[in-house]
């Protein structure tokens, strides 16, 4: 199954000038992405749990790949898949493909998850593919200047679930203690507040 992972502003902006639109990276959100993308989500009516997995894939566009500092590429403990029109050589843990459909030809274990992590065009391809999917969204309560926005979708066709409390339990405890407020079930870093949500279609439950 596909899972889209995105951090977006109140107006659905996801980027500005080839960078995230918030002044500083959000440590708790980054920790959640790292933990989630190395796990299989176990979703029950009352909680979210994670089962570790070293065979998941992260799918991204070439600009997203290039935006990752070289010392962190490829993303560890995950199969990295980069959609790129230009020529590039695949390696043991990184595959360069030219179409979204080429995912089906990659040696991904059937039990693995495929996490789509941006940018906008890759999100669009995932949504247009018709594949069952989840959306893990970190929603930032700000509307900063953005020049890239998440694709338009009918959000009302998804069931929205606040998983912020679950995330506070699943990420590094030091980060949770520093940035999570149990009273409001909200993370706040450097004056920026945000929550995590899971969007599901009824047919993917």
Curated annotation (Swiss-Prot):
The gene is DHFR-1. One of its GO terms (biological process) is dihydrofolate metabolic process. Keywords: NADP, One-carbon metabolism, Oxidoreductase. This is Dihydrofolate reductase. The keyword Flavoprotein does not apply. PROSITE patterns: DHFR_2. Pathway: Cofactor biosynthesis; tetrahydrofolate biosynthesis; 5,6,7,8-tetrahydrofolate from 7,8-dihydrofolate: step 1/1. Belongs to the dihydrofolate reductase family. CDD domains: DHFR. GO terms for molecular function: dihydrofolate reductase activity; NADP binding. Key enzyme in folate metabolism. Catalyzes an essential reaction for de novo glycine and purine synthesis, and for DNA precursor synthesis. Residues 1-201 form the DHFR domain. It catalyses: (6S)-5,6,7,8-tetrahydrofolate + NADP(+) = 7,8-dihydrofolate + NADPH + H(+). Its EC number is 1.5.1.3. One of its GO terms (cellular component) is mitochondrion. NADP(+) binds at residues 7, 13-19, 62-64, 84-86, 118-125. Substrate binds at residues 29-34, 78.
